[in-house]
């Protein structure tokens, strides 16, 4: 007789797409078997590890975590351990050979099959592996979306077809596949009806979105944004992550036509050196990247930009790195996600000679991050005295008499106000800037009929 599984614990590594996928894993298990999430592994009957293979250290973390969970399984033989995400897709059966305590291995495109895979593992008392790429099937089998707060991610596409020389995503998530236009709008409308005020359209290469409409025509991201903006209750729209070569003039024009599209853009550049960009197979030059930002800034002078940077790519010389620093100065980035190059097996870059010493890579990364932190602090200081629209999303961690929310450029703002403002927009005067947040004073708040109650 199979043990009834009641509780699940999930640990997530990596990008926002993985966070989105983890929320869907929890939803399918709850809908199919009534399995509910718990706060610690010790309480769980199912342990899930949603993995990332973008960097080597993230992959090493997977097997370290599985080693820690092995002792739990020895004490609770009925415990089911599952590994999902990009490491699962990349390694498949090898995960079970290296960690035989794992019962289920599933990829990003097969998470909707998780309940059946767990049942199969229980019946067979052996491992089950499903890392196939069934195209858009995943989205057709997911439960109805549920709002857990005033902001929500909506996945509009999967995979990537760019094949940058350093990246494993095309191999682990497959080629680009866009969700049908009406399906995306329906999910956004459902979330809006539940109190979601801000939608973040999500994809590995989101501005390559090409979704089929009901009449057979194809919609791009620019058109999708316009339609999402027309959904009642939606007050803000973001999208991530974009590729510069797909950033069309039509998408740039949405910053003029759609006020609900926030004045902040994350657009990964990776390097400020044309030579390194060519080695990365990024398909654009620095001047083209800057031209796109200039067009957007001409429409939205107050817009802020963030980016991704890879430091120490094979063959990077000091002048290449200096070109990156020059680009940072020219753009004045608000935030960065910056890392030392990590060799990924099977990618073209893994065969390139890497003569940059690790000490040099670390020193360059420290310089880059320090400069962008200075820029971020400068932008925060410049916001003092300004009035900002803040989407209130929770009580402040410091006081129950204060609430916390985010500005369009993702600054956390704490200010005195009642909890009934959660889920509403508030105009706040910024009174002080700190390292990780801003302080403000409430000027006015959006009027809504009733406070929103979110289900978590």
UniProtKB/Swiss-Prot annotation:
Residues involved in [4Fe-4S] cluster 2 binding: 160, 164, 167
Keywords in alphabetical order: 4Fe-4S, Cytoplasm, Iron, Iron-sulfur, Metal-binding, S-adenosyl-L-methionine, Transferase, tRNA processing
Free-text cofactor note: Binds 2 [4Fe-4S] clusters. One cluster is coordinated with 3 cysteines and an exchangeable S-adenosyl-L-methionine.
Cysteine pairs bridged by disulfides in the record: none
Domain Radical SAM core: 146-380
Record GO terms (molecular function): 4 iron, 4 sulfur cluster binding; metal ion binding; N6-isopentenyladenosine methylthiotransferase activity
Cofactor(s) it depends on: [4Fe-4S] cluster
Cellular component aspect of the GO annotation: cytosol
Keyword Iron listed: yes
Top EC group: transferase
CDD domains: Radical_SAM
Pfam families per record: Radical_SAM, TRAM, UPF0004
EC number: 2.8.4.3
Domain MTTase N-terminal: 6-123
Top-level taxon: Bacteria
Domain TRAM: 381-444
InterPro entries reported in the protein's UniProt record: Elp3/MiaA/NifB-like_rSAM, Methylthiotransferase, Methylthiotransferase_CS, Methylthiotransferase_N, Methylthiotransferase_N_sf, MiaB_methiolase, rSAM, rSAM_horseshoe
Signal peptide as annotated in the record: none
Gene3D superfamilies (UniProt xref): Methylthiotransferase, N-terminal domain, tm_1862 like domain
UniProt cross-references to NCBIfam families, sorted A to Z: miaB-methiolase (TIGR01574), MiaB/RimO family radical SAM methylthiotransferase (TIGR00089)
Protein family: Belongs to the methylthiotransferase family. MiaB subfamily.
Role this protein plays: Catalyzes the methylthiolation of N6-(dimethylallyl)adenosine (i(6)A), leading to the formation of 2-methylthio-N6-(dimethylallyl)adenosine (ms(2)i(6)A) at position 37 in tRNAs that read codons beginning with uridine.
Protein name according to UniProt: tRNA-2-methylthio-N(6)-dimethylallyladenosine synthase
UniProt source species: Dichelobacter nodosus (strain VCS1703A)
Name of encoding gene: miaB
């Amino acid at each position: 007789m199979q043990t009834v599984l009641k509780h699940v614990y999930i640990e997530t590594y990596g990008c926002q797409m993985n966070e989105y996928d983890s929320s869907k894993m929890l939803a399918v298990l709850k809908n199919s078997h009534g399995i509910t999430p718990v706060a610690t592994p010790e309480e769980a009957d199912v342990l899930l590890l949603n993995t990332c293979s973008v960097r080597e250290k993230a992959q090493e973390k997977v097997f370290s975590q599985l080693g820690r969970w092995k002792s739990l399984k020895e004490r609770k033989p009925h415990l089911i351990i599952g590994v999902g995400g990009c490491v699962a897709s990349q390694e498949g059966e090898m995960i079970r050979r290296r960690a035989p305590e794992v019962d289920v291995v599933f990829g990003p495109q097969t998470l909707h099959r998780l309940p059946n895979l767990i049942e199969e593992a229980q019946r067979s008392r052996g491992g089950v592996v499903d890392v196939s790429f069934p195209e858009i099937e995943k989205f057709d089998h997911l439960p109805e979306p549920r709002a857990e707060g005033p902001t929500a991610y909506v996945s509009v596409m999967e995979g990537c077809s760019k094949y940058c020389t350093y990246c494993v995503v095309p191999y682990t998530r497959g080629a680009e596949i866009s969700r049908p236009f009406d399906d995306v709008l329906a999910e956004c409308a459902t979330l809006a009806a539940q109190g979601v005020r801000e939608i973040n359209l999500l994809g590995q290469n989101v501005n390559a979105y090409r979704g089929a409409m009901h009449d057979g025509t194809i919609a791009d991201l620019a058109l999708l944004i316009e339609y999402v903006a027309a959904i009642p209750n939606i007050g803000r729209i973001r999208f991530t992550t974009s590729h510069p070569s797909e950033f069309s003039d039509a998408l740039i024009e949405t910053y003029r036509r759609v006020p609900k599209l926030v004045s902040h853009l994350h657009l990964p550049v990776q390097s400020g050196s044309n030579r390194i960009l060519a080695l990365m197979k990024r398909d654009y030059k620095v001047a083209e990247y800057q031209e796109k930002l200039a067009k957007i800034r001409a429409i939205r002078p107050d817009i802020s930009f963030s980016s991704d940077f890879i430091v120490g790519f094979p063959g990077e010389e000091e002048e290449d790195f200096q070109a990156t620093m020059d680009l940072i100065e020219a753009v004045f980035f608000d935030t960065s996600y910056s890392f030392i190059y990590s060799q990924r097996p099977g990618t073209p870059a893994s065969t390139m000679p890497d003569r940059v010493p690790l000490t040099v890579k670390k020193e360059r990364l420290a310089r880059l991050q320090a400069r962008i932190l200075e820029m971020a602090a400068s932008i925060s200081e410049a916001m003092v005295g300004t009035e900002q629209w803040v989407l209130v999303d929770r009580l402040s961690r410091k006081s129950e008499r204060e609430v916390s929310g985010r500005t369009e450029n993702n600054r956390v703002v704490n200010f005195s106000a009642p909890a009934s403002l959660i889920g509403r927009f508030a105009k706040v005067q910024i009174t002080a800037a700190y390292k990780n947040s801003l302080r403000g004073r409430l000027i006015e708040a959006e009027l809504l009929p009733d406070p929103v109650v979110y289900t978590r």
